[in-house]
């Protein structure tokens, strides 16, 4: 992000634009041969570095889109607009790449349900309410940064949420693929890759963050869930009550199914 910022015991100073361009070009050149032909790369940045990143990215890869992530939280400013957005550049190594659209649909509540001949049109009627599964755009407003009350939260100053990384990995990789994050931080990419049955490699220079990453990977064994992603779909922001309702019903249905299966198995043995 080219900021003057302290990450635990390491302080980075903001570089001049030319120096930041050289730095970005250097690490992208190093990553290029590691990415397979059908692979994709996502680069996060702020508004100030976005043009630099996008231009240099196009030197090595096929730039497909620029995603704008509305983080919700941001520092106020007296003489400027509050910065509550980040850019995420999406690029591929070739014209043949993985993109799983159905894996990243967003479930949205239908405010004014429309029917044709009494039947729902382009939406589903459920016990929890009326919803429509929509294709995501390049404006992501359904993902917040990790707050103190979230189990995934750490003291890392620029931690990405598991929901954000899950959307990227589900769209551009498949189960069993290998995911690389050369700026791992507190381990979110590796944790999400583990939860989504991907292999992972993370690189991080700060030892304390490596410890946090290992702890989170251990916790993922006990809790493989991703907040905001349930039953194969992403949910809107501020819909936790609905998510919990669906999750509880799903667990009950699974328990009932298991009990029924056990009953049939027992009868078959008589």
Residue positions per predicted region:
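S-adenosyl-L-methionine
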Residues: 214-255
């Amino acid at each position: 992000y080219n900021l003057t910022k302290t990450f635990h015991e390491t302080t980075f100073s903001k570089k001049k634009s030319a120096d930041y361009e050289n730095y970005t070009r250097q690490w992208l050149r190093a990553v290029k041969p590691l990415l397979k032909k059908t692979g994709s790369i996502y680069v996060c940045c702020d508004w100030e570095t976005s043009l630099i990143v996008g231009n240099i990215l196009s030197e090595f890869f096929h730039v497909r889109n620029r995603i704008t992530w509305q983080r919700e939280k941001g520092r106020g400013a007296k003489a400027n607009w509050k910065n509550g957005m980040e850019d995420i550049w999406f690029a591929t190594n070739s014209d043949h790449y993985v993109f799983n659209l159905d894996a990243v649909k967003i479930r949205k509540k239908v405010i004014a349900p429309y029917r044709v001949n009494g039947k729902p049109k382009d939406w589903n009627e459920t016990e929890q309410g009326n919803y429509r599964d929509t294709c995501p755009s390049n404006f992501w407003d359904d993902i917040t940064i990790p707050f103190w009350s979230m189990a995934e939260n750490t003291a890392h100053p620029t931690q990405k949420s598991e929901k954000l990384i899950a959307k990227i990995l589900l769209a551009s990789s498949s189960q069993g693929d290998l995911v690389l994050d050369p700026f791992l931080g507190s381990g979110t990419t590796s944790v999400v890759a583990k939860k989504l049955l991907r292999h992972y490699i993370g690189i991080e220079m700060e030892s304390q963050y490596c410890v946090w990453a290992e702890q989170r990977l251990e916790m993922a064994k006990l809790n493989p869930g991703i907040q905001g992603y349930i039953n194969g779909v992403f949910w809107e922001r501020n819909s936790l009550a609905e998510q919990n309702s669906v999750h509880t019903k799903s667990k009950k249905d699974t328990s009932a199914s298991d009990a029924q299966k056990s009953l049939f198995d027992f009868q078959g043995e008589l």
